Curated annotation (Swiss-Prot):
The keyword Lyase does not apply. Subunit of the heterotrimeric GatCAB amidotransferase (AdT) complex, composed of A, B and C subunits. Allows the formation of correctly charged Gln-tRNA(Gln) through the transamidation of misacylated Glu-tRNA(Gln) in the mitochondria. The reaction takes place in the presence of glutamine and ATP through an activated gamma-phospho-Glu-tRNA(Gln). Pfam families: GatC (PF02686). One of its GO terms (molecular function) is glutaminyl-tRNA synthase (glutamine-hydrolyzing) activity. Residues 1-23 form a transit peptide. It catalyses: L-glutamyl-tRNA(Gln) + L-glutamine + ATP + H2O = L-glutaminyl-tRNA(Gln) + L-glutamate + ADP + phosphate + H(+). NCBIfam families: gatC. This is Glutamyl-tRNA(Gln) amidotransferase subunit C-1, mitochondrial. Residues 51-70 are annotated as: Disordered. Its EC number is 6.3.5.-. It is found in: Mitochondrion. GO terms for cellular component: glutamyl-tRNA(Gln) amidotransferase complex; mitochondrion.
């Protein structure tokens, strides 16, 4: 877990959020001064085909309905690195690659479903009338009560461990 000293303030032009992101993306070896050489090729996210995570238009599949998908869909190293960055999950092992490819193969089975003539839904409860209530604050100014639920806080923020590292780690045997 990375803790920021209480008196530390972000430099002008930087927010606390950007500092936390910088620290969270730094390996512990980088913080101690002993840097290990990273052999992975870095992705230039400005040159991505889709810089936004939300597609701007529907994706047209090259697979036709009813066509069987290949048994294994290979995933290149650059895609794995992007997935690791977005999901904060380490996929370095061969077992993780197999699990990822199995998940892609399972999800690609939906391409064989014939949806011709079926209108898209906005919600699964489209036939039910959903009533909305007025947006009124009923119990405001409870920030301190909410922050008491956190194990670690820093300047009115929850402190979370970077990535998928739990706050309390079990001792290794």
């Amino acid at each position: 877990m990375i803790r920021i000293p209480f008196r530390l303030r972000p430099p002008p032009g930087r927010t606390l959020h950007s500092l936390v992101r910088t620290f969270a993306s730094t390996k512990p070896a980088d913080l101690t001064g002993t840097q290990e050489k990273n052999t992975r090729q870095k992705i230039n996210f400005h040159e991505l085909k889709h810089p936004s995570k939300v597609p701007q238009r529907p994706h047209k599949s090259t697979t036709t309905v009813g066509q069987s998908t290949p048994t294994r869909i290979p995933v290149d190293a650059q895609t794995v690195q992007l997935l690791e960055r977005l999901s904060l999950v380490d996929l370095d092992s061969a077992e993780a690659h197999r699990t990822l490819e199995d998940a892609i193969e399972f999800a690609s089975q939906i391409l064989s479903v014939d949806t011709e003539g079926v209108e898209p839904l906005y919600t699964v409860l489209e036939r039910e009338r959903l009533t909305l209530r007025e947006d009124r604050v009923t119990d405001g100014n409870i920030q301190q009560d909410v922050l008491r639920n956190a194990r670690v806080t820093e300047e009115e923020y929850f402190v979370a461990p970077p990535g998928n590292i739990p706050l309390e780690q079990e001792p290794r045997k």
